[in-house]
Amino acid sequence: LERYNGPVLFEAPAAAEILAQQFAPRLLAFREPVSDDPRFDLFIGQTMSQMGLGSFADRLGSRVLPDFLDVTDDPRPRDFRGAPLLGGQAVDDDGVVPRATLLVERGVLRALLATRVPARGAPRSTGSRREWGGPAPSNLVVAATRSAGEAQLRRDLLERARARGLDHAVVVRRVGPAAASTALSRLAAQMGGGAEPGGSALAEVWRVFADGREELLRGVEIAEMPPAAFKDIAAAGDRPAVWSGEFMMGAAHGLGPGASVGSEQPVVSCVAPALLFEELSLVGARGPFPAPPVTPSPLAGR
């Protein structure tokens, strides 16, 4: 795959992971540091922009998702339909008891996650200060008021691809770790190829055809994922899945305001259905790729 511009279907676990990586950091409220050094201010501004921090501070009351999606951060539940949720906590690092916070209602941004440090768009704490020193989600739950089954999502995906003159579409089943994504992006950009910094490496990507054929693609990254990509989500599935992992924002993009060297990354959980994006730009990472072993492992088949 050299480049693909078209509809992309993220199956449920991958959809939850990409939301945790690319959408959740925009839901955090930060107060920008004030200094008398314009170079420091420029550095902090560029860092926060790259991380997406503060990008929704001026978007309260504006649409950031389609009108059939709601997003809630809720530290209280321990599981979702039997799958454990690992992001909950009884009290945050500021000593504030966290509560369920409706962040996005019918696609409209209603609130941001905040600490006790006042910030634009967040006049009070939501009990979200976590290990890394700043706000972070706990259990992020994405709910769809309008959903479709797996077969319908696949048909919709292929129809949208056909309308663009494409003979295939793309399905993402696993997303790579955020830290690896950013490292790969920066390395590729420095070497003159691949995605620009800020993209996400995708661990398992398939090219799908109308006749049912599927081809595995290697070394695929999202070139960029602007906020508009989330507004243009076309459909959602009817079977939510859980993804849990480290909230790698600080480690992947550089330390954000309030983070400290050596600070731990909080564990978060995200619940989301499959999501059909109207349009994303994917690029193939340039090789060389590691070759498979010449002989099979002696442990193979055991």
Where do the language-model regions lie?
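Internal alpha/beta scaffold segment
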Residues: 1-55, 59, 63-67, 110-111, ...
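Dual-mode signal for accessory low-complexity, basic/Gly-rich regions
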Residues: 45-302
